[in-house]
Amino acid sequence: MSYSKIPAGKDLPNDIYVAIEIPANHAPIKYEIDKDTDCLFVDRFMATPMFYPANYGFIPNTLADDGDPLDVLVVTPYPVAPGSVIRARPVGVLHMTDEAGGDAKLIAVPHDKLSVLYKDVKEYTDLPALLLEQIKHFFENYKDLEKGKWVKVEGWGNADAARAEITKAVAAFQK
């Protein structure tokens, strides 16, 4: 599969495609899809034994502030297989900075055509408060045992802020 051939979405910035690298609740292994080969590589075994609280991946054909495609967490009822592409709707963004600079994490839910379970979720605040705390806690702590790495969570942004991140990342990729 060539992820470069997958558009960023069907109706940007409201309807996006996300290439999943790490399924929700998976073992603490950081996978990354290599942009040159389109292969799923083991990036590292995470030193801090934590699992991603939602499916983790990126929007193809985008470029975020950290020089990588825009990161997305997709909340689903079940873990999604690594390498899969899922159609989703952005509902928020977790603003963060790490040792490499700005590192926003979009929060999304499956498009209504995939599941009606999230049809009433329009903003990240419509998700369970505990899940939001788990996401924040994960990113505040998942690099704790890795020397030279750190994360500072700066706060949440709404669906409009998430859509603005998408628009900016698509424009940056097209430059």
From Swiss-Prot:
Sorted alphabetically, which SUPFAM superfamilies does this protein's record hold?
Inorganic pyrophosphatase (SSF50324)
Please give the GO cellular component terms listed in this UniProt entry.
cytosol; extracellular space
The entry marks the following residues as binding substrate, namely K30, R44, Y56, Y142
What top-level branch of life does the organism fall under? Bacteria
Record keyword rRNA-binding present: no
Gene3D superfamilies from the xrefs?
Inorganic pyrophosphatase (3.90.80.10)
Q: Where Mg(2+) 2 is bound, by residue?
A: D71
**Which reactions appear under catalytic activity for this entry?**
diphosphate + H2O = 2 phosphate + H(+)
A Pfam entry, by short name: Pyrophosphatase
Q: Which cofactor does it need?
A: Mg(2+)
Q: What is its EC number?
A: 3.6.1.1
Which positions does UniProt annotate for Mg(2+) 1 binding?
Answer: D66, D71, D103
Q: Where in the cell is it found?
A: Cytoplasm
Q: What does this protein do?
A: Catalyzes the hydrolysis of inorganic pyrophosphate (PPi) forming two phosphate ions.
The record's subunit annotation is: Homohexamer.
Family the UniProt entry places it in: Belongs to the PPase family.
What is the name listed in the Swiss-Prot or TrEMBL entry for this protein?
Inorganic pyrophosphatase
Q: Which gene encodes it?
A: ppa
